């Protein structure tokens, strides 16, 4: 058993060294980014040690980083890119829409058409609301659930990422020594600055 642990540790060190060799430009960008962005990025959910690679371009299931390393993307923007990166049909539709305007402070028919398609295809959808992010979606969902049930508490998947608002920034990456019992895990704040009642 100890031999396997040593082997795994050595493999991890070798992989980290290889990563450092392949990504010097990403590291330089990250070092500069830390001067302007907390932690070097606007999204702490996509940070990993020792630093993230910075994407230069993407196509299909591939992303190319600032150092020219071509990687197969198994995350696909947390599974939102179901057609892959930069599919021609989507790029063409986006270009056509951009020519008509970038953003409006008013509704447009496209959202009605998409909402209708989704409600017709998903039987449990009576009505829906589009959001800008998963964080906004879970924040609004919890607010609606509290209003509907009159209850303030809810269950959250241990170790699961559900956005970055206060209510769900709990137990994202938990050290096994702090996790507690598997049947009743400890709720641990994943960030400083959370209100006292969040982890109760």
Language model features by range: what are they?
Residues 52-75:
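Active-site and channel-lining beta-strand-loop segments
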Residues 23-27, 57, 84, 88, ...:
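Electropositive phosphate-/nucleotide-binding environments in soluble metabolic enzymes
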Residues 9-57, 197:
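Active-site-adjacent loop/helix segments that line or gate small-molecule/cofactor pockets in enzymes
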Residues 1-6:
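N-terminal acidic, proline/glycine-rich, low-complexity intrinsically disordered segments
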Residues 24-32, 62-69, 119-120:
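Short, hydrophobic/aliphatic alpha-helical segments
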Residues 59, 80-83, 199-200:
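Short, well-ordered beta-strand elements within core beta-sheets of diverse protein domains
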């Amino acid at each position: 058993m100890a031999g396997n642990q040593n082997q795994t540790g050595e493999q991890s060190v070798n992989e980290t060294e290889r990563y450092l060799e392949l990504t010097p430009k990403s590291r330089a960008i990250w070092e500069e980014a830390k001067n302007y962005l907390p932690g070097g990025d606007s999204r702490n959910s996509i940070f990993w040690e020792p630093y993230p690679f910075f994407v230069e371009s993407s196509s299909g299931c591939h992303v190319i980083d600032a150092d020219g390393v071509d990687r197969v993307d198994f995350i696909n923007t947390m599974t939102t890119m179901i057609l892959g990166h930069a599919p021609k049909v989507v790029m063409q539709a986006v270009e056509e829409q951009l020519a008509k305007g970038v953003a409006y402070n008013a509704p447009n028919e496209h959202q009605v058409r998409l909402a209708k398609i989704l409600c017709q295809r998903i039987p449990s959808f009576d009505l829906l609301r589009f959001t800008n992010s998963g964080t906004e979606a879970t924040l609004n969902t919890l607010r609606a659930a509290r209003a509907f049930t009159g209850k303030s508490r809810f269950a959250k998947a241990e170790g699961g990422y559900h956005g970055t608002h206060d209510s769900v920034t709990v137990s994202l990456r938990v050290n096994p020594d702090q996790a507690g019992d598997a049947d009743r895990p400890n709720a641990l704040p994943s960030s400083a600055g959370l209100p006292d009642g969040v982890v109760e």
